[in-house]
Amino acid sequence: MSHRRDVETDDGTRIAIHARRPDRPAEDAVVFVHGATFGARPAFDTPGYSWLADTASRGRAAYAVDAVGYGDSDRPAAMDDPAGDPPSRADRVADDLRRVLDSLARDHDRLHLVGYSWGTMVAGLACTRGTELSSLVQFAPVYDPDPARVSAFDPGPDPAPKRETTRANTRDRWDAHLPTPSDYRDPDAFDRFWTTLFDGQGVRDDPPTVEAPNGTLLDLTAAATEGPIYDAGGITVPTLVVRGSLDRTATRADGLRLYDDLAADDAEYAEIANGSHFLAIERRREALFDRVAAFHDRQ
């Protein structure tokens, strides 16, 4: 069963943490950070596809953090101010994550951090901000993408504070990664994922629509036009870079650039065959879960 706990930041913002724990006290905890569009529960705790539940079943506590503006965390006032700056930039979220990690460190001896997509930027920044970590996993990282891909991220010269994504848009995006979606994704996977997402971020039923803050897109655009927003050369903890072989968002070339820039003596790069950017909710998810758990077992 999942549980929720909250952490308050210095400015009073409430950050939600979704937790699954093993039956016995756990010395190790794994902390997950979601990507730019979908919050913690759809990314890591979709019923029947839960990476949190898998982690807890292996004896580690599992926590997934909702960044500000996502899921059950506080909604920034800037999201509803057309003249406001797009909220939820990685730099701010990394500071919030540090507060979360410091809180969890009181309950566990070892913390393992897992970033996903845009969440790898947050995780990369957090690694250099003082909290002691036992390892880092950068899953489906967007690190130093080809500048030719900037149109996939750029919210424009006068970006709105938030964006909307419909159910149809979300399914089309996922389908675009897969040669034949039914060969790679269970029949009920999308519906379960969308229901979990809409429960946390839904704003309209006709058509079914969710919202996300646009600060994340500014981070991705900056990485594509200016280079990485965090210093991989400052990351010294054991690190695994892992992606699905079909991922069109987190490319092989970009993942290898991150791997090559890491300062960690213990660094690995891995690919999971026949998985997309949504690998954690696809049929090959167990291969991902096993690979990450094996990496954690060594630390």
Regions found by a protein language model. Name each.
Residues M1-D23:
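N-terminal cap/lid segment of alpha/beta-hydrolase-fold proteins
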Residues P47-P76:
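Conserved alpha/beta-hydrolase
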